[in-house]
Amino acid sequence: MSKVCVLTGKRPKYGNTVSHANNHVRTRFEPNLHTKKIWIEEEKRFVKVKLSAKAMKIIAKTGTAQLAKLLK
């Protein structure tokens, strides 16, 4: 299962979690992804996509036209 946002392209980042004692432990920081069913007006159908929280805000502001272009 891919952890990549369809619209923004966000993917996992790698880094360290640092404790109070300054111990470094390698970790993987996951993007805030949600699987959503979105109605694409241009195609008259629902599309199931993985979106980050930022992408959901973009769609709420601008609409699904940008997403429809990416899916073609």
UniProtKB/Swiss-Prot annotation:
Q: Name one GO molecular function term.
A: structural constituent of ribosome
Q: Name one GO biological process term.
A: translation
Q: Which HAMAP family match?
A: Ribosomal_bL28
Q: Which UniProt keywords apply?
A: Ribonucleoprotein, Ribosomal protein
Query: Member of which family?
Result: Belongs to the bacterial ribosomal protein bL28 family.
In the UniProt record, the gene name given for this protein reads rpmB
Q: Which Gene3D superfamilies match?
A: Ribosomal protein L28/L24
The residues the entry assigns to the signal sequence are none
Cite the SUPFAM superfamilies for this sequence: L28p-like
Which InterPro entries does this one have? Ribosomal_bL28 (IPR026569), Ribosomal_bL28/bL31-like_sf (IPR034704), Ribosomal_bL28_bact-type (IPR001383), Ribosomal_bL28_sf (IPR037147)
Could you tell me what this protein is called? Large ribosomal subunit protein bL28
GO cellular component assignments = ribonucleoprotein complex; ribosome
